Amino acid sequence: MKTSMPRALLALFCLLASLAHAAPNSILHRPYDLDTGHGVLRGSLLLPRSAVPPPVVLLVAGSGPTDRDGNNPFGGNNRYLLRLAEALAERGIASVRYDKRGVARSLAAAPREEDLSVGVYVDDVVAWSERLARDPRFSRLILVGHSEGALIASLAAPRTPAEELIAIAGSGQPIDRVLREQLRGRLPPAQLRQADSVLASLKAGETRGDIPPALANLLRPSVQPYLISLFREDPARAFGRLRIPTLIVQGRNDIQVGVADAEALQRAKPDSQLVLIDGMNHILRIAPSTGLQQLSAYNDPNLPLARQLVEAVSRFILRGAEAEKAAEPLQKSLPAPTSSESRPVKAAGQRMSDDR
């Protein structure tokens, strides 16, 4: 008996050690790049080990030079997209996130900012989606867009094999209106009038060269072609055109996009699920609505994501996977339609071969 106890403790220690090492090794981290034919986009894949192909999420980042992890030289180092990808992988959901054209390691794909447009970003999402749909390691594709990425994903979705779309902190109103609201409380009256004049010109499709130094970072001439393309779009209208299941997630302490935006998206597509999260800010952390803690969250990559966000997103994706699995035996048991019968209705979340 005296020798069995140390052996038992040793066996327990070895078991715990093996479990500690098993969790990270159960998720593959791999580069995942896309050659678009006019530039290579660099990305990262998180793939949980699974006996069956898991669903895969394509994460579409927000505005400006936001990289694949969610970091932005103007918006902070907080890695919100990386943290979301990790949380989804722990729940059996694969993901690909990427540096946008002209950003970080995809800079060479668009070295000139003047060459960027919403249409270019939409085409890139379509190309990524087509590659993921061809990859046999994945069962189904879900687009997840954050902030401006929700608009880009909404515009791209009808051209992709995506079966669901999730909009996180996505605007529900035209972006020029959003910029005006954001500037209204931050600029003195004279500068605000100048900004309104420039925004009106861009909305009309006209570039401006007379940008005051105080506004140069936001409205510099090199970014104006992109803003002109962005101001043409209506996020709610684009979202309302979608014919796939959709989830809207919005934090109540978001100082950049408000609950009214999420409600506008739901009005545009009433069958969408809407989840409002108390305390969550724009970068998906729990933070006060004002003060230093709200701002400091933008530069703290170690803050955990809002738990309700991860639960809502993963539940929506996994329920879609279960619905697809449940529909398969039913479709297989149906008799083949005769020429006089109508084509079987496509089950929610299920792709039929004719639709590809």
Predicted regions and their residues:
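Conserved alpha/beta-hydrolase
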Residues: 80-107
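Short, surface-exposed "cap/lid" segments of acyl-processing enzymes
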Residues: 51-53, 57-88
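Primarily recognizes the serine-hydrolase "nucleophile elbow" in alpha/beta-hydrolase
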Residues: 130-187
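Catalytic active-site module of serine/aspartate enzymes centered on a nucleophile-bearing elbow/loop
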Residues: 283, 289-334
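N-terminal cap/lid segment of alpha/beta-hydrolase-fold proteins
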Residues: 23-52
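Alpha/beta-hydrolase active-site loop
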Residues: 80, 113-134
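Short beta-strand/loop motif that positions the catalytic acidic residue
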Residues: 242, 248-250
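Accessory cap/linker subdomain of secreted extracellular hydrolases
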Residues: 166-237
